[in-house]
Amino acid sequence: MKQLLVLILSLYTTLAWTVLEVTILKQDENAFPIVISDFSVIGDANQGKIIAHVIRNNFNRSGEFSASSVNYVINNKPNFDKWKAKKIEAIVLGKLEKISKKVFNVEIELLDVFSKKILYKDKFVVHNRGIRRIAHYLSDQIYHVLLGEKGSFDTRLAYISVTNKGKGEREYRLEISDSDAQNPQTILKSKKPILSPVWSPDQNKIAYVSFKNARSEVFIQYPFVRRKTQKLPYFDGIASAPSWHPNGKNLLLTLSKNGNKDIYSYQLSSKKLTRLTTDVGIDTEASYSSEGDKIVFTSNRSGQVQVYIKDLKTNKINRATFKGRYNAKAVFSPDDKSLAMVHRVGKDYRIALLDIATKNLTIMTNNQLDESPFFSPNGSMIIFATNKGSSSVLSVVSILGRQTFELASKAGEVREPNWSHYLK
């Protein structure tokens, strides 16, 4: 029984938050057809429905599956021929047993309709507060069994919400949530702009930019422990665009301390600052590759805004983008084979995907003003901010080009998303 995994889930304190509404935009007609049955229960029926509901929604949000429900609980001996006739390929069923006031036994099975075999089976002990978390974990396991790669459901998002308070005042919030926008938490509130939140590799810290002292400074917030916010030293001029090294010990920063915007590496323990670019042009928006041996950044050194890659071992810098006059805000895919970026098409700014080896650039969206792309941990999806009407929302597109779901707030704008690594 995997008690350790689940008895300590979701224990951080909620302050206040912006509720995001999730809208599934598209489903591919070729998506994998699967049925997620409500769990049979002994005790509390509602919790069994929650687990099935979360798994079902996760799969539909992925763009890879068409997950449906039934209005009854499927027992452990389903009629496979019936489901085969309905062109269902797999069935998820489970059982939930209440063993104390707030603790449950959870059992789950994934069945192949055609072979009639059990593809995955497991059981857990879970605290009431960990019900949604275990559903995300199980979604990842099922996704892996069916598609051969891990899902990105047991992860978190960070983003900035902006609310108009009237009389020209705005409230900025640094917020986090589960990958499906549930369990939202407000980490920081400010009347001054907050920008560029980015999760640390261990998911315990968030670096961001704040103007609370009437200048741009980089801070590190600890959302899950009672620890004082860490402010990086003040560097003359602008400090912006923080990005973590995979080892969690260094941050990339854009600084103008020498009069020109360049990329620097800042070592947190020694406070050592290393300059990585020296061009007379503006260099900004840098991020590391998954191994930390390369950085990608935006520069106007060619006379246009383009994306460049620097090899930190050889110090060689190569231009990565040649299509179009504007490419910016690039990030590496988890396998380092692709870059997601903002690409201008006419007067519109859209999310594009660049194959680094072939230089093939694919336009992924059809919006007017997209910004801040970031990959899911498994590389199958890209989250970004986009304008919708007079507001800003978060949207997700799969790397296959399907815009799968959207996160919006009735209270104001949502912008600058960042997707965490896998939770531990």
From Swiss-Prot:
Encoding gene (name): tolB
GO CC, alphabetical: periplasmic space
Lineage, uppermost ranks: Bacteria, Pseudomonadati, Pseudomonadota, Gammaproteobacteria, Candidatus Pseudothioglobaceae
Cited function: Part of the Tol-Pal system, which plays a role in outer membrane invagination during cell division and is important for maintaining outer membrane integrity.
Transmembrane segments: none
Compartment list: Periplasm
Keyword Transmembrane helix among UniProt keywords: no
Record key words, sorted: Cell cycle, Cell division, Periplasm, Signal
Organism: Ruthia magnifica subsp. Calyptogena magnifica
Protein name: Tol-Pal system protein TolB
Similarity-based family: Belongs to the TolB family.
Keyword Protease: no
